[in-house]
Amino acid sequence: MAKEKFERTKPHVNVGTIGHVDHGKTTLTAAITTILSKKFGGAAKKYDEIDSSPEEKARGITINTAHVEYETASRHYAHVDCPGHADYVKNMITGAAQMDGAILVVSSADGPMPQTREHILLARQVGVPYIIVYMNKADMVDDAELLELVEMEVRELLSKYDFPGDDTPIIVGSALKALEGDQSDIGEPSIIKLAEALDTYIPEPERAIDKPFLMPVEDVFSISGRGTVVTGRVERGVIKVGEEIEIVGITPTVKTTCTGVEMFRKLLDQGQAGDNVGVLLRGTKREEVQRGQVLAKPGSIKPHTKFSAEIYVLSKDEGGRHTPFFNGYRPQFYFRTTDVTGSIELPAGTEMVMPGDNVSIKVSLIQPIAMDEGLRFAIREGGRTVGAGVVAKIEE
């Protein structure tokens, strides 16, 4: 069956469901696709179609995720739902599915549970910018005061992890009732309300091409009589011939000028996000640029050696370590195109980290790397991946 053509007419936003096991994330996902497909077109997905999600690999880690899409009047949404808690942890840390916003599902009957807290913390650590709450299973609660209590608890929990708890949209409903076609407030109308909250509360994400120019250096060679050419894939922004750029990371930052952009051996006047290009640099020697550095718009990114991160450590079954690691562990951190050695400081009270765990750590690299908060990396030992992580906060 041929895939339907992807209409690029509406702005595209990435979202996903998060929350405690059995609070109804997958049922809600099914309800959203079913109800919005009736109203705006698109494909309805049943619970079991979403639940039997295929495995995918991100940075060498196998993750189960279900991808569905749906439309509202003004937007196109790509939505990810994970079957198991471990899949969420891996998904959010590797950035396999970057989220512009998340729908936190909380059972009205149970209130916030341990994974509710953990998913909010993860969302904060990995830089999910917006959370909307769907208080599910409202048909199981008769007492309005109890619903208010759960709502208060959820708002407090969000505020505790630096989300604006007081201003977060909270929609009360029952995904199951909505799927059954119930027309009361907690049925179908609650899903329409949720869609409206997605449209209004999550701002339209900035497109990669509109961000400041950045290109990781993959290869460097000199062309006699023309100078040094750096090749790579433009990660964001646009580079035009004649523009000043900085070479950032590993060695002290230097400025240079782009004197040419080529793609498939053709000269262009610019390269943009997504293009694989060669950038010709004026007056730069071949030995002054190396893999692991980035070319960037001057002042847009700085090199750093110390940061805190959230990491997931591969289990033995995933091809990771067989033994735990301890404070002071020194693996390689693979950023964009190269490995840099760094040492790990564990949080107070954490003796060791077992394969299969996720943990917040502090890292000191032996060489500075161009980084922003939210940058993903792999943790490697002798070339094999033993973990994945994301920069949560830059220290220096």
UniProtKB/Swiss-Prot annotation:
Which residues lie within the region annotated G3?
81-84
ATP-binding found in the keyword field: no
- Region G4, annotated ranges: 136-139
What molecular function terms (GO) are annotated for this protein?
A: GTP binding; GTPase activity; guanosine tetraphosphate binding; translation elongation factor activity
Q: Where is this region: G2?
A: 60-64
What residue ranges are annotated as transmembrane?
A: none
Q: Where is this region: G5?
A: 174-176
Q: Which domain of life is it from?
A: Bacteria
Q: What is this protein called?
A: Elongation factor Tu
